[in-house]
Amino acid sequence: MTESVLDYMTRLGRAAREASRVIGRASTAQKNRALQAAADALDAARAELAAANELDLAAGRASGLEPALLDRLALTPARIDGMITGLRQVASLPDPVGAIRDMSYRPSGIQVGKMRTPLGVIGIIYESRPNVTIDAASLCLKSGNATILRGGSEAIHSNRAIATCIQRGLAEAGLPAAVVQVVETTDREAVGALISMPEFVDVIVPRGGRGLIERISRDARVPVIKHLDGICHIYVSQHADLDKAWNVAFNAKTYRYGICGAMETLLVDQQVAERFLPEMARRFVEKGVELRGCERTQAIISAKPATEADWHTEYLDAILSIRVVDGLNQAIDHINHYGSHHTDSIISEHQGEARQFMAEVDSASVMLNTPTCFADGFEYGLGAEIGISTDKLHARGPVGLEGLTCEKYVVIGDGQLRGQGSC
């Protein structure tokens, strides 16, 4: 009899839960050995990876997949090199598991502190890019978690081939293959099952378009680590160094249009707008960026009228909204109303103004004189990241190894007894 999707996912979940107990107590050396061996396996399997990837690319071309998506799907030699390097880099990162902090003596004589422990089983749901399989698997493995990976159906052959290499690495280190499992059915029912198994899955991390993430957030019966949009702002204050502001704003928008940390709205203090905007517009127009502005912006530079929808939009493209504001308070109000709580930056040489901005802007990352595109795990010194969270529970900002662990209390005594009057 053919196994149902629910039965299949239950089998994966049960195997992952059992494997999580093994990887959770594995030594740092054993986990690093698995990562290095997986990197070696990827290097040795380049032909297999290319063949599997070509199956996905051929299917994508036949189904009319857009060129940009085909590009994201492709496993070029350089991208395989990047995956190998990524595995080795994660192996070199400090292991957060077992770290104890804040040990202190209480008046009773007991010591109390906190220990980092794995979350358990992490479900990752993502689209298109097969290299996410490596990013997610390596971070979960190093942080002592088992993972169930559900990639996009367009990358099914590539993801299977990559998972096989990772499982070879696990076997070489004496760890169970179920530490990293790829969902091998393209049936969408598998996603519904994965997000509805709290007995087997401890947290879900969705990576993809807004529709996917909204659906997961709405329907999941387990906690979700996510961000919906990257509507990032830069505010150029009246106390800005304009040379610095031109360079920072230009980099924030044009470094890469398609990343969640790209600036989407530029806010400019009215006191500097007439000096700042003409040169800023010249640079953006020369780069091919379409400008959309408020009425005060349009009175200074040539720009299309910005609509209410523009302030809510993550373009992920060469389009920028510009608004002239009365001052710092209006800039903060705009960001907190229209922003996505991702990353926002102020350009200013005034320390008090910068402190107010950082205290009052409700975002996962707040910056001073820094392009928003620096919102990245590697740039923050976290190593690789599994994503960026705009939630306030459990992790906020780039989620690296430590974000894939939690803390439990450690209490050490020497036979102390609690007295009746201490309750």
From Swiss-Prot:
CDD domains: ALDH_F18-19_ProA-GPR. NCBIfam families: PRK00197.1, proA. The keyword Oxidoreductase applies. One of its GO terms (molecular function) is glutamate-5-semialdehyde dehydrogenase activity. GO terms for biological process: L-proline biosynthetic process. Its main location: cytoplasm. This is Gamma-glutamyl phosphate reductase. Its EC number is 1.2.1.41. The gene is proA. It catalyses: L-glutamate 5-semialdehyde + phosphate + NADP(+) = L-glutamyl 5-phosphate + NADPH + H(+). The keyword Oxidoreductase applies. Belongs to the gamma-glutamyl phosphate reductase family. The lineage of its organism: Bacteria, Pseudomonadati, Pseudomonadota, Gammaproteobacteria, Pseudomonadales. HAMAP family: ProA. It comes from Pseudomonas putida (strain ATCC 700007 / DSM 6899 / JCM 31910 / BCRC 17059 / LMG 24140 / F1). It is an enzyme of class 1 (oxidoreductase). One of its GO terms (cellular component) is cytoplasm. It holds the Pfam family Aldedh. It is found in: Cytoplasm. Catalyzes the NADPH-dependent reduction of L-glutamate 5-phosphate into L-glutamate 5-semialdehyde and phosphate. The product spontaneously undergoes cyclization to form 1-pyrroline-5-carboxylate. Pathway: Amino-acid biosynthesis; L-proline biosynthesis; L-glutamate 5-semialdehyde from L-glutamate: step 2/2. Keywords: Amino-acid biosynthesis, Cytoplasm, NADP, Oxidoreductase, Proline biosynthesis.
